[in-house]
């Protein structure tokens, strides 16, 4: 698996990350430049058809490349799942907020290709992402789930050790209706039981 010294590394083998890793016949690896067209297409599908993302116009390939580079340049994990050369989904972490007191908190994003939903890809990606995040100094991982009716994402995060931390009512408006966001949270490493070094 390609890695860089600036990115936390963990083995490719399935790991225990608070819960048992789902069995998915796929390979999880670090993103490569040639993955971006498929990533752009997957995200565009979710922007156009769902409420997981509050974007309403899908970003183009140039914008998606810039976003990916920003994650990697920050030393944060950006992963893809593939099977037989086909990209099934992707997941990455970003800093939760830009102000310095948030420096030990990350936010996750997970998007799955429409024809790979329900195959354990999301769980495999998210658990691997959690393991990568635990390879760094971070202490909390936040999921900002678009739409309180998004049972797939809520269930995925709950299965991976997240708990609901709050609901922001009607903060989005898409497809002619108001949409909530659900904040979910999971500790990384020792969480808040110890002070960071």
Swiss-Prot record:
Tell me which EC number(s) this protein carries.
Answer: 2.3.1.183
The UniProt keywords, alphabetically, are: Acyltransferase, Antibiotic resistance, Herbicide resistance, Transferase
Q: Do you know which InterPro entries this protein is assigned to? A: Acyl_CoA_acyltransferase (IPR016181), GNAT_dom (IPR000182)
Coiled-coil ranges from the UniProt annotation: none
Residues engaged in binding acetyl-CoA: 110-112, 118-123, 150
Q: Which residues does the UniProt record annotate as the domain N-acetyltransferase?
A: 26-189
Similarity field: Belongs to the acetyltransferase family. PAT/BAR subfamily.
Full protein name:
Phosphinothricin N-acetyltransferase
Organism listed in the record: Alcaligenes faecalis
What taxonomic ancestry is recorded? Bacteria, Pseudomonadati, Pseudomonadota, Betaproteobacteria, Burkholderiales
């Amino acid at each position: 698996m390609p890695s860089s010294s600036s990115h936390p590394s963990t083995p490719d083998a399935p790991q225990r990350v608070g819960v048992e890793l789902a069995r998915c016949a796929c390979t999880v690896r670090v993103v490569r430049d040639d993955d971006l067209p498929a990533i752009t297409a997957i995200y565009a599908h979710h922007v156009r058809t769902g409420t997981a993302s509050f974007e309403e116009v899908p970003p183009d390939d140039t914008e998606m490349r810039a976003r990916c580079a920003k994650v990697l340049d920050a030393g944060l994990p950006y992963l893809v799942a593939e099977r037989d050369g086909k990209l099934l989904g992707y997941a990455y972490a970003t800093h939760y907020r830009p102000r310095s007191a948030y420096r030990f908190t990350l936010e996750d994003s997970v998007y799955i290709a429409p024809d790979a939903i329900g195959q354990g890809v999301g769980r495999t990606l998210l658990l691997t992402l959690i393991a990568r995040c635990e390879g760094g100094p971070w202490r909390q991982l936040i999921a900002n789930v678009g739409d309180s009716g998004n049972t797939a994402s809520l269930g995925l995060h709950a299965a991976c050790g997240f708990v609901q931390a709050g609901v922001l009512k009607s903060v989005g408006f898409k497809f002619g209706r108001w949409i909530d966001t659900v904040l979910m949270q999971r500790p990384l490493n020792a969480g808040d039981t110890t002070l960071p070094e």
